């Protein structure tokens, strides 16, 4: 590793530790020439994932865009930001494990819905309303009835339609 102080190419590792939740390795190094100490990080290079939007447009996967959508859906719920970041990390890891480098936005939306459903019904409905492009009250009612049937299958419900 090249020293940032004198540009010498030889250094020794003084200390290594896992960082960023196991996603990188932090190394303290010392230049063998000038004895300057510096820190480097080693990260796994993630392969790019392309998202195919509903209109056919292709975009690079943007974890911050996904996180923003989830934060908005979870406003005024008990789900904290760190939990949402963890969910996004899990979704991103899932995408990296897929053999295909392209994925439809609907598949990502379904992953988010699975997580949010376990966290908060309110967040689930909010995200589903945007992701599913709800057109009106009937779409909300259908989704609420589906949630209710799945949560309490032994009950019988009157439908509004």
Swiss-Prot record:
The keyword ATP-binding applies. InterPro entries: ATP-cone_dom (IPR005144), NrdR-like_N (IPR055173), RNR_NrdR-like (IPR003796). One of its GO terms (molecular function) is double-stranded DNA binding. Keywords: ATP-binding, DNA-binding, Metal-binding, Nucleotide-binding, Repressor, Transcription, Transcription regulation, Zinc, Zinc-finger. GO terms for biological process: negative regulation of DNA-templated transcription. Its cofactor is Zn(2+). Residues 1-21 are annotated as: Disordered. Negatively regulates transcription of bacterial ribonucleotide reductase nrd genes and operons by binding to NrdR-boxes. NCBIfam families: transcriptional regulator NrdR. This is Transcriptional repressor NrdR. It comes from Synechocystis sp. (strain ATCC 27184 / PCC 6803 / Kazusa). The gene is nrdR.
């Amino acid at each position: 590793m090249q020293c940032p102080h004198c540009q010498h190419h030889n250094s020794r590792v003084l200390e290594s530790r896992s960082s960023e939740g196991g996603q990188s390795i932090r190394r303290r190094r010392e230049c063998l020439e000038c004895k300057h100490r510096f820190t480097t990080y080693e990260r796994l290079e993630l392969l790019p994932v392309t998202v195919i939007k509903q209109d056919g447009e292709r975009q690079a996967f943007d974890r911050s865009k996904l996180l923003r959508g989830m934060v908005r859906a979870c406003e005024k719920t008990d789900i904290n930001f760190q939990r949402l970041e963890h969910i996004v990390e899990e979704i991103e890891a899932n995408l990296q494990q897929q053999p295909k480098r392209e994925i439809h936005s609907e598949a990502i939306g379904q992953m988010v819905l699975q997580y949010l459903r376990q966290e908060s019904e309110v967040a689930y409905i909010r995200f589903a309303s945007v992701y599913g492009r709800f057109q009106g009250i009937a779409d909300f009612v259908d989704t609420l009835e589906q949630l209710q049937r799945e949560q309490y299958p032994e009950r019988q419900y009157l439908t509004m339609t």
